[in-house]
Every structure is written in C-alpha cells, then in structure tokens.
C-alpha cells in the first residue's frame, strides 16, 4: 500500500474492525490504473469453481457444527480462503447451496456464455482488462470494493490474521495488532 501510518499503537483505529483498518489506506488511492470488468471476471471464476462442486461441498462440510448445522459466516470465510475469491463472490457461491454435490451445468453455461461473448467481441483481454479502441483502457480511478477486498484478503492470509477480520484492535493481542499494522 502506498499509504503508511505507524505510531506507537500501530496506527490502528480503535473504532474500526481489522478489515476496515487494513482497507482504509486502499480506499483512498486514486491514480491512473487499468480498468477491469469484474462482473465478467467473477462470472468466469464462478463457472470455474462450479465445474467442481465436490470441492465446494468438501469446504462447506468443514463448516458444520456438532449438530450438523452449517455456519454461514464460517463457510463464507472458508470459501474465500479455499478459492481465493472476494467476500462478494464467496456469498454468491454460498447462495448456490452446494451442501450436497449436484449437476451445475445449467448454472455454468450462462456464466461461460457471457464471458465468451465479451471475449469474442474484443471487449476484454485474457485477464479481463477492458479494451477501448483496440488498446487496454486505463483511467484515473479509485479501487473498487472487489479489488480492495481481494487485496485485504491476500495480505491477511500472508500475515495469518484472516480469522480476526471482524474484531476490533482492543480485542487482539499485541502480536496480532502488530500483524494487522504490517498488513
């Protein structure tokens, strides 16, 4: 991140959760950068994940309590970590209710068709960057919620604090606060 504050108390705002503390600096970046079509990127990623519903079922089975009830919050976090997706994509994935594996070809086909149509029309590159006038498009912009979420989740995995994202700094030990500041 280009914004860095480091004070005696690791510059963690006490009224913001760990997630909000990490994303704060990212939300303030505004510069020229490539423009991506995240709707299509997420559609392609969902199609890829849904093509292997047994993997999703395996992850969801790990999120059951002693009575066999599925913990939605834990499931979303596990999906984020297992498939490296944002929380928004993980919630969409959870909404497919893949607790039991089933044939997902009916859901995969429209997702793939949408992505293939955009690629055939030459609207996006392989990495979903928007193309205008035959060139990848850049603009002065802020990071989208999706980009911020992916960045926050990536750095939280690196410093091993992904399980503390909804906690406040006062609820963390000194070492955990230090890892949040590093992230």
Description of each model-found segment:
Residues 2-3, 9, 152:
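ABC ATPase nucleotide-binding domain
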Residues 5, 11, 160, 179-183:
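ABC ATPase nucleotide-binding domain "signature" region
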Residues 20, 26-30, 83, 94, ...:
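A short, conserved alpha-helical patch in the ABC ATPase nucleotide-binding domain
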Residues 24, 28, 32, 158-161, ...:
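Conserved amphipathic alpha-helical interaction elements at protein-protein interfaces in regulatory
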Residues 31-39:
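Flexible, disordered linker segments and immediate boundary regions flanking tandem C2H2 zinc-finger modules
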Residues 38-64, 77, 81, 102, ...:
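Conserved ABC ATPase "signature" region
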Residues 144, 163, 168-172, 176:
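Conserved ABC ATPase signature
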